[in-house]
Amino acid sequence: MANVVILGAGLTGLSAAYHFEQAGFTDFEIFEMNEEAGGLLRSFMIDGFTFDYTGHLLHINDEYFASFINTITSLDAFIKVTRNTAIYSHDRFTDYPFQMNLFGLPYDVIYECIEGYVNRRAGLRTPKNFYEWVLKYFGAGMGKHFFFPYNSKILAYDMRKVLPSWTGRFVPKTNLEAVLKGAFEQKDTSNIGYNSQFFYPKTGGIQHLIKSLERATKAKPRLHHKVVEIDVKSKTITFANGATTRYESIISTLPLNELLTMVKGSSHRSYGAAAEKLLCNSVVNFNLGFNRPKLTDRHWTYYPEKQYPFYRMGFWHNINPTSVKPGHTAIYGELSYLGKNTSKTARTALVESAVAKALIVLGISEQEVVVRKDLHLAYAYVIYDAWREKHLENLLKNLAHDGILSTGRYGGWKYSSMQEAVIDGKIASENLLPKFWGAQTIKKQTPPTTVKQINAL
């Protein structure tokens, strides 16, 4: 029996283990249901191509996270990239972000967007949903031509039922001067937004990050251990393979809705009903490798219009040329759906339609496709609806009362980055240490590199 059991050996779970060890605490075990650690940060090497679960790109704006990366691996192991992206709509490419780059669109679309921005509902005090939030900050025209169709595709949900609390740093705001300048001339906005610059491993795909963290952590995950029940009265976890283990505290990075269905013996009897209310969409990521040396110099392109089944298409060879064979190129495409409303047959048809459309858009024949790898993300984007907003905090508090700290992107049921996943694991370990060690806390580390220095590289 270990005092602490960590469920899930993705980035958050491994981060918790790493930070326990950094504090000198080793009375814990990690359990992972898959055949290897990593979760969605696994990479696949196929015939000279490297594919990830969509575009997992590393964004660094936290000093501790910078020091963490430089400790478990090295920034020298990463390529630093300045974003080169576009939006494809109305049969043409325009720069991203949309709200600052209307130049190149049809004149009537530009007029509609500017008029909508000038007459936007800025006086709306508290937007009730994402639809109203767009009307308040961007106006009806920009909503019509980008924000509503694109976000409807990526979330696969009604924009009037999605709350705007997820937007934060992910949707850059604008002003009238920026809108007008971006309408009449092409501007360089590559430095706008949280993803204006990113890091990506020179070799090994994004799994390099997981492998580095595994090497830096002495404790190894016990693989092929899928949780089926957590009895909070007897403090016993039962796994699908028949194994059981006792615990004092749990750090769970499992999807929150699944976790709630596993908990037994709690005084909080509403867990099962709550699990049904938590919504999250799914994404199919199709990866294609081509026997063609050049496609585009962009890193990815957004497709807001309905005629394209995918909402985004990225280009692996531009993110890292070593991701493909010499003289070849590769893409990733993403399309989302709400799992409860989509049968397996419908999903398969949707993916095949998306692949066929992607080849047409790129002007590539089926004969030029040398490799294909479809990856399914059963959990992709959490839906920020009214039920989540009202009940999530209490759910997490009740689980904590039952001895379960649920954290990470899906454990915390939120939209977050790899940086936040690592910090979530760090915080989880720090929260539990006093329970076993009194007032002792994690050893402080001196950051070898600051974010300011990183951005100067």
Question: Where in the sequence are the language-model features?
Answer:
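Active-site-proximal substrate-binding core of FAD-dependent oxidoreductases
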Residues: D374-H376, L433-L457
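Active-site/ligand-binding neighborhood in enzyme catalytic cores
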Residues: R92, V109-I110, I114-K235, R246, ...
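Dinucleotide-binding Rossmann-like beta1-alpha1 core, especially the glycine-rich loop
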Residues: D47-G123
